[in-house]
Amino acid sequence: MNITELMELFSNPETIKTLETGDLMTGIGVTVVLGMGITVVALIFLMYIIGGMAAIMAEKPKEVKETAAAAPKPEAAAAPAPAANNDEELVAVIAAAVAAQLGTSASNLIIRNVTRSLDTTPAWGRAGIVDQMATRL
């Protein structure tokens, strides 16, 4: 029995029961290989489509044209004066938040140093934290 006839017999559930063990195992193997083969080919096809789309959508480096007249170099800007004022406000806000958390007055606290810590939480983690704070508290 060739594979085409065997697959025709596999299309009817009643005829599967009449097959010999060897033919049944051959049909099962052909079905599995055919199914996996089609899946692998489809995934490879999708891989190439996605790769092509990524190549099309990728930003191309912009070419900078040199002009004959050199643009004047910007001078270094002076540091803004209100920065010290913002630091004092930041310390006041942090002191108020800590005092509120501890249930005491801000005048009872002594803040010696305020340093920024690096946030290594991924974007999805920050989104989860915001979601929990918004919906569960």
Swiss-Prot record:
Pfam families: OAD_gamma
GO cellular component terms listed in the entry, alphabetical order: plasma membrane
TM ranges: 30-50
Alphabetic keyword roster: Cell membrane, Ion transport, Membrane, Sodium, Sodium transport, Translocase, Transmembrane, Transmembrane helix, Transport
Membrane topology: Single-pass membrane protein
Reactions the enzyme catalyzes: (S)-methylmalonyl-CoA + Na(+)(in) + H(+)(out) = propanoyl-CoA + Na(+)(out) + CO2
EC code: 7.2.4.3
Enzyme class: translocase
Functional note: Subunit of the sodium ion pump methylmalonyl-CoA decarboxylase, which converts the chemical energy of a decarboxylation reaction into an electrochemical gradient of Na(+) ions across the cytoplasmic membrane, thereby creating a sodium ion motive force that is used for ATP synthesis. The delta subunit is required for catalytic activity as well as for the proper assembly of the individual subunits to an enzyme complex.
Protein name: Methylmalonyl-CoA decarboxylase subunit delta
Gene designation: mmdD
